[in-house]
Structure formats: structure tokens, C-alpha cells
């Protein structure tokens, strides 16, 4: 074969390979587009919508009534109302709409959803102290009955125990680690009921945890220690997910293809979400508490 013939053959082979590659890509592209187009981007869970509507409406009504009946403290209540609105909006964005739809198909989106609930919405709700506003929204007889119930020793004692620094830390940590065991996580993906239980345990555990850190009874030193150790163990779980050589959750294997990822790449992204942005949330809160503590000590020193 002449040199010119060899070059012509090589060019033909390259063209054929390119044609085959393009054909293969085009063959998979419609499948990916069809899979993405088939997603219900606005899934509706009636019970979630009902809870969001009820809690939001009661809080708004309660805040309006508080402002009508009290001449002082409006600035404090305004800050709490803004905190509640922020927590409510983050919860709604996490549980209703595209993020919830994506979380069923991408582990990384699932991690964004979980961290939004645990690291953003939960502390905002704790800062909002919504029980007072909800009580104002209820008929007076009901609010008094609820007040008597929650002040009973049989209720207050367990509450003081579970919101203690160590107990709340353990509940939050156990919920996080246990639900990321592959068999547990896969069970949540396979069952709507178990999935709801997973979200409830994450959210309730986070509320207890953040109450121990931001609540009225908090000790600044204990709160900073809790935040630091939580940042360490959540970063460890995130690192395990991000650096693992194998995918932990096989259910996602066929679901991530439509988004140009394989299951391991998706898991690595999810691990990074838990490792870095969520960890930054704990660090930022710890620094804020430390700064407030130092300012208080400085004021006490000047007063002395």
C-alpha cells in the first residue's frame, strides 16, 4: 500500500470511529433527555403541604395578635418572625418542588435536601421560638390547656433530659450515621413511609440538637464543644462518602445516567456537600457563639 493509500485508510478509519461515537452519543442522548423530561418536578405530598400551610398560617396569625396586644418587644418578635419565615421557606423548598424531585434520582440532591433541613431550617426554627406565636393563634382556652400540659413535671423532665447537650448530640449523631448505613438508606428509597420516618428523625434530631446549642439554657462552652465535635463527625461521614472507591447505594446506579453522572460520582458530590458546606455551618455558628461570649466577658470586665 502506498503512503497516500495508508493516509487515506487512516482518515477513513478515524471518520468511521467518530461517526460511531457520535451515533452512540446520539443514541443515549434521547434516553437521557426523556428520563429528565419524565420527572415530575413539582411532586405534591398532601400531608407535607397541610403541615406547611397550618404551621405558617398559625404563626402569622399569632404574630399579628402579639403585635396588637403588646406595645413592647416588637423588634424581638420581628426578628423571631423573620427567623421562622426563613426556616419555613427553606423547609418548603426542600420538601416541595424540584429539589425533592431530584433527591429521588441524585444522591447529591438528597444530601442538599437533608443538610437544608438539618443545618439551615432547624436552627432558624429554634431561633424563632414559634410555640409562643402558635399559642397566641389558638383560642385562649386551648392555649391555657397546652400551657398547663407542657409545664407538668411528667413532660418537663423528659424534655430537659433530651435537650441536654450530651443527649441531644447523641440523638442527632445517631440519626445521621444510622440512616446512612446502606441497607437503611436503601430501605428509605424503596418505601415512602420509611423515607418519611428518615426525614422526621433527621429533622426532630436536628431541632433537639440546635435547641441544646441555641436554646435559653445553653452553656456557651458546651455549645462550642458540641458544634466542634459535630463538625468533626459529620465531616468524617462526608469524607467516607466522597473518598469511597465504591458506590454505597445501588438504587441510584440507573437513576444518575440521565444527569451525566455515574453513581460513584454522584455519591462523591453528596459527600462533599456534607463535608464542606454543612461543616461550614457548624463552624460559623460556633464562631458566632464564641464572639458573643467574648463580648459579654468584656462588658463584665469593664463593669467590674
PLM regions with names:
Residues 9-12:
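Transit-peptide-like, low-complexity N-terminal presequences
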Residues 14-15, 25:
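Cleavable N-terminal signal peptides
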Residues 2-5, 23-304:
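Alpha-helical membrane segments of multi-pass proteins
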Residues 19-20:
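Alpha-helical transmembrane segments in inner-membrane proteins
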